[in-house]
Amino acid sequence: MNEELIQGGLHTDARGVLRFCNDFDMSAVKRFYTISNSAEQPVRGWIGHKKETKWFFPLRGRTEIGVESFGQDLQDGQDFGFRVSSSECRVRINEENAKGSSARFILNANEPKVLKVPPGNWFKIVQDGNAEVMVFSDCKVGEFENDDFRREL
């Protein structure tokens, strides 16, 4: 899986709170966005990329991120039931042979860390209450055509 957890820090004084992650090298980042799931649907995923790297940084609350490596068939690019949705430009995956090893990470805004999820992995985001996470990507929208994979929860 090769995911990486980059330690950050927190400084509080009379002026307020400073959250940081000074060891996060952002030279590969090309865009960013934030995610805050709705109370009705606190789970988002499974989403996978063969080429794109994602980094996650907690802005507010607690976010759990499950990471699972692609199964060997998907890594090898074998067709085992891909269904392409041209309207969404996403590939939907047949569940069998799609999974590999897995890990779970808890990101909390009060304990700043950056989670790196390299290509070749699925991720799932579960958020509590009003949690919000910032996501960084190493590609522009549309840069890697057909690199957006979906799996059932």
Describe each model-derived feature in a short phrase.
Residues 1-71, 75, 100-111, 130-153:
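Non-catalytic, conserved peripheral segments adjacent to functional cores
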Residues 69-103:
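Intrinsic disorder/low-complexity segments
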Residues 7, 86, 93-95, 109, ...:
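Surface-exposed beta-strand edges and flanking loops
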Residues 107-129:
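Conserved metal-binding segment of the jelly-roll/cupin
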